[in-house]
A protein has these predicted regions:
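Amide-donor transfer/coupling interface in amidating biosynthetic enzymes
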Residues: 6, 104, 118-224
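Cofactor-binding loop segments of dinucleotide-utilizing enzymes, especially the Rossmann-like FAD-
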Residues: 7-9, 34, 90
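Catalytic nucleophile loop
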Residues: 77-102
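Flexible gly/pro-rich beta->alpha loop and the following alpha-helix that scaffold active-site loops
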Residues: 23-86
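Extreme N-terminal starter segment of soluble prokaryotic enzymes
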Residues: 1-5
Length: 224
């Protein structure tokens, strides 16, 4: 059906369940890095752009100077080509910023599995979805809210572009990779690593189905 370009910002980030869902729907994908040392990728030959998460913040001026400015420009190129974007966590915040919204430090960060509430007739399922974020989006006027939690916007669209604050790609392997990459970092006031891994192992079979449903919602939206 087409080809998807996934952009990651850390080597331990992978398409995971979302990559599997696109494959199940007949797509192929490629995964490239976007950071200060990586060249800006070409969009030629792709039908969908997916921007994964990052530990960084879109409002960090040093990050923008190092590589995020190029990512914003790439999003502009995608818009010119009519290439729909799916933004995940940092990717959703990048979309929010690109479309004129604001991203700010959240007073209610979320780490773990959370339910979300759908809005405006969206078909985003309640979850639970895996969350790992400390920032939140303040949407631009032209955005349509698709889902929220008490602490954050959880899903939205602007035209054919869709952002989700949660991590639909996460399974137990992905979460373990994140933890192994940051052995000295763990958020305070949340469940322990072992507890999060155990819950993620329990949730992964259902999360796989939810990821497929999310890709179906996205694909239906971009061809509507």
């Amino acid at each position: 059906m087409g080809s998807v370009l996934f952009i990651r910002h850390h080597l331990e980030d992978n398409p995971g369940l979302i990559g599997d869902a696109f494959i199940a729907r007949g797509f192929t994908y490629e995964l490239v890095m976007m950071d200060e040392s990586a060249p800006t990728p070409s969009l030629d030959g792709y039908d969908v752009l997916v921007i994964l998460g990052s530990k960084e913040s879109v409002y960090d001026h040093e990050v923008e100077a190092a590589w995020f400015g190029r990512e914003l420009a790439l999003m502009g190129e995608a818009a010119q080509k009519g290439l729909p974007i799916l933004g995940i966590c940092f990717g959703a915040q990048a979309l929010c910023r690109f479309h004129g919204g604001r991203v700010e430090l959240s007073d209610a960060p979320e780490v773990g599995w959370y339910e979300v509430e759908a809005h405006n007739g969206s078909k985003i399922v309640s979850g639970p979805w895996f969350e790992f974020h400390y920032d939140r989006c303040v949407l631009p006027a032209q955005a349509q809210l698709w889902a929220s939690s008490p602490g954050a916007v959880q899903a939205f669209c602007v035209g054919k572009n869709v952002g989700v604050q949660f991590h639909p790609e996460v399974d137990e392997d992905q979460l373990r990779d994140w933890f192994e990459a940051d052995l000295d970092e763990h958020p305070r006031d949340f469940a322990s690593r072992d507890e999060l891994l155990a819950q993620t192992a329990r949730e992964t079979p259902a999360a796989r189905e939810r990821a497929l449903e999310l890709v179906d919602v996205f694909l239906a939206h971009i061809v509507d």
